[in-house]
Amino acid sequence: MTVARPSVPAALPLLGELPRLLLLVLLCLPAVWGDCGLPPDVPNAQPALEGRTSFPEDTVITYKCEESFVKIPGEKDSVICLKGSQWSDIEEFCNRSCEVPTRLNSASLKQPYITQNYFPVGTVVEYECRPGYRREPSLSPKLTCLQNLKWSTAVEFCKKKSCPNPGEIRNGQIDVPGGILFGATISFSCNTGYKLFGSTSSFCLISGSSVQWSDPLPECREIYCPAPPQIDNGIIQGERDHYGYRQSVTYACNKGFTMIGEHSIYCTVNNDEGEWSGPPPECRGKSLTSKVPPTVQKPTTVNVPTTEVSPTSQKTTTKTTTPNAQATRSTPVSRTTKHFHETTPNKGSGTTSGTTRLLSGHTCFTLTGLLGTLVTMGLLT
């Protein structure tokens, strides 16, 4: 059977459509013979074209997941231009995922999850306690990636371990402001009058699989004052070998000496060093210059009647004598009497009447006065 061919007149209309058909063919061909076209679309990912417009054979294009999506581990994220101007096949490789799980101070992710970066909804991760912490059996150490791409709330399933009780310091104090759990710090001090030897603080640190204090307890040693100062002409009562804080030393003076200052001084502390509260007293003897000076005799005035040549005239002479007067002027004569005397001369004796009073004590007369008295008394003629 012979197929009828169209006649020339019938084929003419097709020639008029030839330019349009050629244009469609050219648009479908690659820009350069042997090039691949634009890379294929991948859900939730974008190709990294880096400004290229042609993709010759063996060209590799890598995709990057869009925001909030993460590459699925093990899935391809690139295509290659093959012979025949065709791209290699690629599957969807981006999916929604939680971010890296929350970092906890008390716990860390177990080994399988440390390097993982893809955590789709429903993923469960597990933690283990860090050194210095212990598991709380009643609480779960797991977290879950929720539908909102957030991790479930982490509870405190790991608790700090406790250091041993630090004990006590003799004559000192231990300050424990924050307890004795892992990471705690305690400080030491001594009572007044004692000096600290050792560390002033200690820390609760990791020691193997447990925790221990970093430093042992210090020692508080008593502070002593230097030997008390000795004093001249005195002694220390009940002297001892050592004098600690607030202990006192008492002084006493030898016989015949007087104490000047405080009888006692006591031991004090200044900048962890012992020192005495003050200087010791002094013992001073009785000075000769402190004796009462002797009383100097005052001049004594005595009225002594004198004898005149003329019996008709009478004259009384008053003389004043001084104990230390020179002999060239008068010779003092001392007489002591314990009674009061009154002498009256006889009438008609030719002498002037008078009265001589001698008081107890020392009475001094001049020689002339003494002779006159003796004549009056009839002892001399």
Swiss-Prot record:
Record-level GO cellular component terms: cell surface; endoplasmic reticulum-Golgi intermediate compartment membrane; extracellular exosome; extracellular region; ficolin-1-rich granule membrane; Golgi membrane; membrane raft; plasma membrane
Glycan attachment sites: N95
Tissue: Expressed on the plasma membranes of all cell types that are in intimate contact with plasma complement proteins. It is also found on the surfaces of epithelial cells lining extracellular compartments, and variants of the molecule are present in body fluids and in extracellular matrix.
One term of GO molecular function: lipid binding
Pfam families per UniProt: Sushi
Recorded domain comment: The first Sushi domain (SCR1) is not necessary for function. SCR2 and SCR4 provide the proper conformation for the active site on SCR3.
Primary role: This protein recognizes C4b and C3b fragments that condense with cell-surface hydroxyl or amino groups when nascent C4b and C3b are locally generated during C4 and c3 activation. Interaction of daf with cell-associated C4b and C3b polypeptides interferes with their ability to catalyze the conversion of C2 and factor B to enzymatically active C2a and Bb and thereby prevents the formation of C4b2a and C3bBb, the amplification convertases of the complement cascade.
Protein name: Complement decay-accelerating factor
